[in-house]
Structures are given as structure tokens and as C-alpha cells.
UniProtKB/Swiss-Prot annotation:
It catalyses: (2R)-2-phosphoglycerate = phosphoenolpyruvate + H2O. The active site is at E210, K343. The lineage of its organism: Bacteria, Pseudomonadati, Pseudomonadota, Gammaproteobacteria, Moraxellales. This is Enolase. It comes from Acinetobacter baumannii (strain SDF). Component of the RNA degradosome, a multiprotein complex involved in RNA processing and mRNA degradation.
Amino acid sequence: MFMSQIVDIRAREILDSRGNPTIEADVILESGVVGRACAPSGASTGSREALELRDGDKSRYLGKGVRTAVQNVNSSIHELLVGQSVFEQKALDEKMIAFDGTENKSKLGANATLAVSLAAAHAAAAEQKLPLFQYIANLRGQTTLTMPVPMMNILNGGAHADNTVDIQEFMIEPVGFTSFAEALRAGAEVFHSLKSVLKKQGLNTAVGDEGGFAPNLRSNEEAITVILQAIEQTGYKAGSDIMLALDCASSEFYKNGQYILEGEGNKSFTSNQFADYLAGLVKQYPIISIEDGLDESDWEGWSYLTSILGDKIQLVGDDLFVTNPKILQRGIDEKVGNSILIKYNQIGTLTETLDAIYLAKANGYTTVISHRSGETEDSTIADLAVGTAAGQIKTGSLCRSDRVSKYNQLLRIEELTKAVYRGKAEFKGLK
């Protein structure tokens, strides 16, 4: 007999990987089972993301405290959900959404609702003696579990680094392997090889928020070149074993209708010119995925980008779709992009996150489950990626325990499930 009633909900202020406060929530059941989860936090954020509630009191944590969000959990959300069955994930989330009553969760804070929503799923899984990935799979009747292809951010520019490179993330995707464990090993080897390539050139090998290197390279193409050298040095083949992926985070350098690349001598591009610039990179290098290639408001530009590259590579909407099913539906209707980045703190509940994932899947869009640049030891996204058979996961580089905790959880899950690693099957145009 399950004792699934929620008897207590508690939240506290903890620190994330950048030393900023975030919120951790515990959901406690009648049986004594405790589910715990933490909310992550982003640096480059889409303007339509759900609101992360911060205190704004400059005398504490430079205004970044989350005491208000903690109080919202310990009072309003506590009153709302105590006494409910933890197995009613959708009902629990809908109660919080209805009570909040705003489009962007600005009353309770998406950091408050998300921490509770995920903690409830952890508690429910523990009460049923199920691994979290299996509980998540059961929520939507997902019968096939797969191991995701990792999108590894090994070189940083843009808002994630203090350097002259405009594109925010240069990533590798180890597609030519038969297991997640082997893919992870290849990624780690390339990461170490990249460090030695940079060292040889007298470049900085300190790492950024997500564990990637942020050397002072002269241009975006130079960043691609050093990664290709690192892949070659490890004995892998770029274009078959390992593909490249970019996150342009274009909204960060979109000013007055122009894309301005400071690292390229302040060159400015119109939407179509920048889309053509990206198409040129795809032609020249083994790039399989581009995220946020254009600004979140530039739907016309996105439409053109999709028309020239959409049948060749993955075009991921992050700031564009902000994990929001309504905005994703517009993208589907207008044939914009062909993939969605899933960041659950952009929307604020597990239920709405699953809605976005399954809407994407039903319409032939790939799904990439993602961390944020401000992370904790919480590894829920690893279970989410497997439990929804998402296909890909983006959780940073191959160092820093806030990133590696997700990879390690995926290794445990692979050992337990023997789930198939997606590899090349995940991508258009890869055989």
C-alpha cells in the first residue's frame, strides 16, 4: 500500500555553481519518503522565459537572494499541495499554475514552482521504488528508453566568456559510437586534447561557467579550427565519429535589426546575410547542429534559415521557443526550426516541460534536454532525457562536478537499462 499523501513541503536557499543563491525544495510523504530537487539558473536568457524570482535586496547576495521564492514554497505552495497525492503530477502542477495565475509565473516564481514540481516527481518515484527515469517514462506512457547523444560545450565565447569570440558555444557531439559510455570517453579525450592544443599555442586554459575553455581566439572560425585539431590529435574522425555543434545565442549580438560580430571586426549582417554566413560554415565544416542561429524575435530570418539548412542539419530553438508549447506550436505552424532545446526552468513545471517535449516529437522536431549555466549537483535532467527518449542532452563540458554529475548519472542509467545509444540515428543527413 502506497502512503502517497504529501504531508510537508519545505524549501531553502542554497548556492548554485556560480556562487549565486538558488532554491532547493523537499516534498515529504506520509510514508516518510523525501523527494528533493534544485532549480537551475541561466545567464543568457530568452525574454519570454518564465520568471526566476529574485529578492532584489542589494544588501544580501548582491540582490540575487531567493528568500521570497523560498517563502512562497513554505507558505502558498505548502497550503496548496499538502494533503494531495504525490502521484497526481499533472494536478499538482496545474494547482500551482492556477494559483500563480500569470503567464510567466511571476507571482510564485518559476524557480519555486519548478523545484517543487521536480521534488514531487522524485518523491513519487521513490515511493513506487522506481528509478526517476522510469517514473517519468510512465507519466506519458513512454515504452522505449534511449540514451541521449551528449552535446558537449568545450569552447566558449559570447556571454559565457570574457573573450573576442561572438558565438557562445562550440560543441562536439560524439555520434559514431555504440554506447553512451564510449561516447562520453571520446568527448573527454577530445576535451583533454583541446587543452594541450591551446597550451601549445600559448592560450588560456581556464574554464568558464559550463566547464568549457574560453581562450582569446581571433575569430569564430579559429575556434572551430582548434577543436578540429583536438579531434584529429585523439585519433577520431571529425564528420563521422564526432560532429560539431554551435550555439550562436544570436540575440546577444542582435542590435537594431543587424547581427554585429565584434570578433570579426564589428562586421554587421542582415538576417539573410547572417543565415548565409552560417550556411557557409556548415558547408566548410562538419557542423550538424546550430542553436539560436538568429534572434528570438526574427521569425522571418528563422524562416529563411530553415529553408536553406533545415533539411541538412538540426536547427535548435532555445531563446526562440523557451520550452513553451504555445510558442513551439507557432514554430511548427510556420515551419521554423526543426528542434527544440528543453530547459525546464524556462517554463517552470515538469508537466509543461513534458508537454513541450511530446509536442515536438509528435511534429518531427528533435528534442535536446539542457542544463543552465548556473547549475547544482541535481542530476534530474539525465533522468528526464532517458525517460522521454529525448535523443540528446546538453550539459556542459567534461569537468566541473555540476556538469559531470549529469554524465555520471547517465552512466549509471545505461548500466541499469542497457538502453540503446542514439548516435547517428538522431540526425538528418547522417548515415
